[in-house]
């Protein structure tokens, strides 16, 4: 009860701040501090590169970015914007979709030259696997579609040669020929285009999609400093090629 009251009180105070900012905006450009929460890899590769242009356009802004792979309480922790994976239901938040992230199984040409490219999911039993462990302790499962349309699941953690938590580290390990890893297309894109990674089992692999969203507190008045930041981030992320690669465009990168 007390936490709920404090959360509602914070929303009310922030609405008051927004009203003050709106009045000020009638006389001046957007200015002030904007606090953003985002995950480490996505924030570094996609959010951070979008900020110089924003700051160049609005020099009165001060952007504070926290890189955190945990799910934060945007209202309680005082964030203006969160860029994160998964649509977390919360009546106090507005959710704007950014993209749907796809994943692929990859290995380096050197690894494939030494061990061969698996032609069926069952053949993975003879290969070196790199697994990802989430902060919750769970290991990411690999899903495959059989000829009859059924879905089979492989737990790479049972026999992984290497288990990592940071998604970008799986890409690096695959590039270093440690083994086969499931990674986000947006993380592997440059390596696929350069030829340093190849996609395997593309016709069988069924990774599903992971939705990236921008969320911000639901309020009647949104401060101009937050409005311009939201607009800029949505436009920048919509134009980010790596985040919108269609799956049928990946066939040319298959082993």
Predicted regions and their residues:
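C-terminal effector-binding regulatory domain of bacterial HTH transcription factors
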Residues: 189-190, 194, 204-255
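Ligand-binding "clamshell"
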Residues: 90-97, 191-201
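Acidic, Gly/Pro-rich loop/turn segments at junctions of secondary structure
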Residues: 57, 66-164
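A ligand-binding cleft/hinge motif common to bilobed small-molecule-binding domains
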Residues: 171-196
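Paired acidic/hydrophobic, glycine-rich loop segments that form the ligand-binding mouth/hinge
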Residues: 81-84, 179-183, 199-200
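Short, well-ordered beta-strand segments
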Residues: 35-37, 82, 130, 181, ...
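Central regulatory/effector-binding core of bacterial HTH transcription factors
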Residues: 31-94, 246-255
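Alpha-helical "hinge/linker" immediately C-terminal to small N-terminal DNA-binding modules
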Residues: 1-25
């Amino acid at each position: 009860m007390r936490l709920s009251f404090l959360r509602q009180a914070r929303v009310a105070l922030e609405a008051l701040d927004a009203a003050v900012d709106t009045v000020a905006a009638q006389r001046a450009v957007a200015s002030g501090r904007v606090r953003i929460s985002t995950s480490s890899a996505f924030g570094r590769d996609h959010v951070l590169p979008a900020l110089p242009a924003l700051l160049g356009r609005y020099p009165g802004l001060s952007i504070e970015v926290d890189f955190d792979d945990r799910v934060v309480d945007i209202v309680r922790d005082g964030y203006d914007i969160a860029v994160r994976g998964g649509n977390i239901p919360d009546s106090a938040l507005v959710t704007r979709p950014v993209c749907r992230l796809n994943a692929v199984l990859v290995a380096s040409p050197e690894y494939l030259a030494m061990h061969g490219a698996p032609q069926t999911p069952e053949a993975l039993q003879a290969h070196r696997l790199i697994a990802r462990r989430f902060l919750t302790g769970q290991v990411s499962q690999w899903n495959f579609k059989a000829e009859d349309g059924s879905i089979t699941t492989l737990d790479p953690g049972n026999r992984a040669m290497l288990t990592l938590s940071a998604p970008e580290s799986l890409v690096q390990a695959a590039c270093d020929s440690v083994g086969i890893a499931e990674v986000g297309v947006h993380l592997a894109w440059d390596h696929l285009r350069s030829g340093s990674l190849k996609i395997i089992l593309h016709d069988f692999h069924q990774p599903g999609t992971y939705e990236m969203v921008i969320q911000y507190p639901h309020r009647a008045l949104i401060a101009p400093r937050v409005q311009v930041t939201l607009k800029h981030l949505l436009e920048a992320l919509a134009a980010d090629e790596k985040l919108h690669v269609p799956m049928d465009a990946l066939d040319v990168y298959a082993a």
